[in-house]
Design a protein with these regions (language model features):
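Rossmann-like S-adenosyl-L-methionine
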Residues: 35-213, 217
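Short, aliphatic-rich beta-strand segments
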Residues: 21-29, 94-96
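A structural signal for short hydrophobic beta-strand segments in well-ordered beta-sheet cores
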Residues: 12-14, 86
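Conserved alpha/beta core surface patches that mediate binding of polyanionic ligands
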Residues: 1-11, 74-80
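Extended interfacial segments that mediate partner engagement and assembly in macromolecular machines
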Residues: 1-5, 14, 19, 34
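Short loop/turn motifs enriched for small/polar and acidic residues
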Residues: 15-17, 28-30, 61-65
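Short aromatic/hydrophobic contact patches that present stacked aromatics
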Residues: 13, 24-26, 100
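Short loop/turn segments at connectors of secondary-structure elements within structured domains
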Residues: 19-21, 54
C-alpha cells in the first residue's frame, strides 16, 4: 500500500526490445529482502514459458522511499545479465532498468534520421549530445561526424553509453557523467567548441534550434 507504506512489491516493470524480442522484468520492492526469490524466479520463468514468453533477465529494484517515483537506486540481478538488447538506427543498445529509451521505436528512428539530416553533417564536425542518456542520438550521428561528445548526469546511463559505443565499434564518441548545463559552460570557458549540439530535451538560448518533442507546443 503506497499510502500506508505497507507491503513488499510496489511495482512490476516490463521492458521489451522491439527488434530483438528480449524481455526484462523489474520487481520494485519496498525492502532489500525478497522472500523466496529463487522459487519466485523459477515459477515466473516457467509460467512465462507456458505463455510463449522467454524472459531474458529479472532484476529486483529496491525503493524504500515514500514517493511516487517508481524506481529506487539499489538493484540486484535475480536472473540473466541485468539488461536487454535492442536495435535502433542500425546500432545495438543495452538497456538497464533505469535507462531512458524512447517507447515509439518506429517514430524514433524517423525522428533521429531527420535530426541528423537537418544538422547537415559532413564528417568534419564536433557534435555535442547534451543530456545524452544511453547515447542513442550521439551514436546515430557518429557515422556522419568527426567526433561526438555526450554528457549526461545519470552515471548509470553514461556507463551504458560507453558500453554501447564499444559494442557498436564507435571509436569517435566520448561520454561524460556531469550536469550538461554546467559542463557546457566549463568546456566553453576552456576553449572547447562544438559545431552541432543535440539537446533532448531542448533548452533556451540556442541561436539555431531544431525542436523535437513527443508533444510539441
Amino acid at each position: 500500500n503506497e499510502d500506508k507504506g505497507t507491503g513488499l512489491l510496489r511495482h512490476c516493470l516490463l521492458r521489451r526490445g522491439v527488434m530483438t524480442g528480449q524481455v526484462m522484468v523489474v520487481l520494485v520492492t519496498a525492502q532489500p529482502v525478497l522472500p523466496g526469490a529463487k522459487n519466485f524466479v523459477k515459477a515466473l520463468l516457467t509460467e512465462a514459458g507456458k505463455q510463449g514468453v522467454a524472459i531474458t533477465t529479472i532484476v529486483q529494484n529496491v525503493n524504500d522511499r515514500k514517493t511516487s517515483v517508481v524506481l529506487g537506486d539499489m538493484e540486484k540481478v535475480l536472473y540473466g545479465k541485468g539488461f536487454i538488447l535492442d536495435e535502433l538506427c542500425g546500432k545495438t543498445y543495452a538497456l538497464s532498468p533505469r535507462s531512458f529509451y524512447q517507447i515509439n521505436h518506429t517514430q524514433t528512428e524517423v525522428l533521429y534520421g531527420l535530426a541528423v539530416d537537418a544538422a547537415h553533417l559532413t564528417g568534419k564536425e564536433v557534435v555535442l549530445d547534451a543530456y545524452c542518456g544511453i547515447g542513442t542520438i550521439g551514436l546515430t550521428a557518429a557515422d556522419h561526424a568527426k567526433q561526438v561528445v555526450g554528457v549526461e548526469v545519470n552515471r548509470e546511463a553514461v556507463h551504458d553509453a560507453i558500453g554501447n559505443a564499444k559494442h557498436n565499434g564507435v571509436k569517435n564518441a566520448r561520454f561524460f557523467a556531469a550536469d550538461a548545463t554546467r559542463w557546457i559552460g566549463e568546456a566553453a570557458a576552456a576553449g572547447e567548441r562544438a559545431d552541432v549540439i543535440f539537446m533532448d530535451p531542448p533548452r533556451e538560448g540556442s541561436t539555431c534550434l531544431l525542436y523535437t518533442s513527443p508533444s510539441p507546443r
